[in-house]
């Protein structure tokens, strides 16, 4: 007979290892390429020493002259706060009792919940990789009334998400958290539940965030690929090596454009690109370019079951969350997802995973991970934007 105790045991012993492996390697092709480590985590912070420049103690001299003066490496310390990543499943008491005498039915129930958790995680963690940590899903493009909101883009939305409307500075407008009930991808609009918005409630320029995520998401590519401001506690104005290579208004994507960026990184930063990610429209434009010149399109198989185009042995992967008209050329060896620990179930003082929701006949279990993404060498990465899509 299935009991709460046996359900807890199943989540701990049978599901945790499998779901952790899938979350780490099958959520996103870029995430699968990034190493994960518990090193450099101190309390609630990541403190990592970053080396830049070269050692100064080298030189040539005469047979009897002075040896080169010793000059060590240059170091700075990156500091950032661990982000709190959660994934929650919910099972009703009725469903638990209905499957109490049928182990197979209960396994199917848990499998279905886990599958839903994986799909939601793949969507949200994949989205965060390209964000700037602010949690902004989209900006409101026009004043909106009723329950439909016009956005500048809806690629970060999915039916079922719980979102809120904020000012451009991240201040909650007090309109409550709303569940997305429809996503109009043709017209860049979303529909949410709850009370209809009135005039002046939602104005152009407002931002839409995931519940609880304002300035709480990981430091994604959107934060790394900037030329001003601070990152990891250091100023880009002072430390130019924190600024990646960024070329705008590219237009048509060609092998020459890609190679120029790769050569620049190699010559100026000693960085070797090993992973290229772009939007689907950019990938199609590159495929069209290859077809125009009768070039063969080579396909590579990546870890996690992903397939990619090949450019001189470098995988080119399209990602739904990559900004339109954009291609990133990365050395993933410079990236690390620093974490306090791998995915774990949130346990109560009694060691139980499944907990009853107060006042409701439902039980929840929550996966947690405390981590953030650090790029040790931002100047060794490149971004091409303004690419004409197909």
Residue ranges of predicted features:
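Short, glycine/acidic-enriched capping/hinge loops at junctions between secondary-structure elements
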Residues: 59-62
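Core alpha/beta structural scaffold of self-assembling particle/tube/pore-forming proteins
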Residues: 1-57, 71-390
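Helix-start/capping segments and mature chain N-termini
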Residues: 65-68
């Amino acid at each position: 007979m299935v009991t709460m105790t046996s359900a807890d045991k199943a989540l701990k012993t049978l599901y945790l290892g499998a779901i952790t492996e899938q979350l780490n390697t099958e959520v996103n092709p870029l995430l699968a390429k990034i190493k994960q480590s518990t090193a450099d985590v101190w309390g609630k912070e990541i403190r990592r020493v970053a080396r830049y420049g070269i050692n100064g103690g080298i030189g040539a001299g005469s047979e009897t002259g002075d040896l080169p003066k010793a000059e060590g490496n240059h170091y700075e310390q990156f500091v950032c706060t661990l982000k709190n990543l959660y994934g929650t499943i919910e099972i009703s008491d009725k469903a638990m009792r209905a499957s109490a005498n049928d182990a197979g039915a209960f396994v199917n129930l848990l499998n279905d919940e886990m599958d839903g958790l994986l799909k939601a995680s793949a969507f949200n963690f994949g989205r965060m990789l390209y964000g700037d940590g602010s949690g902004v899903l989209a900006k409101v493009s026009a004043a909106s009334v009723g329950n439909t909101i016009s956005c500048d883009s809806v690629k970060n939305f999915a039916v079922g998400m719980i979102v809120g409307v904020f000012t451009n500075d991240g201040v909650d407008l007090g309109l409550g958290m709303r569940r997305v009930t429809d996503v109009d991808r043709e017209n860049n609009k979303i529909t949410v539940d709850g009370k209809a918005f009135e005039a002046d409630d939602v104005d152009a320029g407002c931002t839409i965030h995931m519940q609880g995520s304002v300035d709480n998401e990981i430091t994604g590519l959107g934060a790394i690929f900037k030329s001003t401001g601070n990152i990891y506690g250091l100023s880009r104005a002072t430390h130019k090596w924190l600024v990646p290579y960024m070329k705008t208004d590219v237009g048509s994507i060609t092998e020459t454009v890609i190679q120029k960026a790769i050569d620049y990184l190699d010559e100026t930063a000693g960085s070797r690109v090993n992973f290229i990610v772009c939007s689907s429209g950019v990938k199609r434009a590159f495929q069209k370019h290859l077809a125009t010149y009768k070039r063969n399109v080579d396909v590579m198989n990546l870890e996690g079951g992903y397939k990619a185009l090949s450019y001189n042995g470098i995988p080119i992967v399209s990602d739904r969350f990559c900004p339109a008209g954009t291609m990133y050329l990365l050395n993933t060896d410079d990236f690390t997802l620093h974490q306090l620990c791998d995915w774990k179930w949130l346990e109560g003082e009694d060691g139980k995973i499944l907990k009853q929701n107060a006042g409701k006949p439902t039980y929840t279990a929550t996966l947690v991970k405390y981590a953030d993404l650090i790029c040790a060498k931002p100047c060794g990465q490149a971004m091409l934007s303004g690419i004409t899509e197909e």
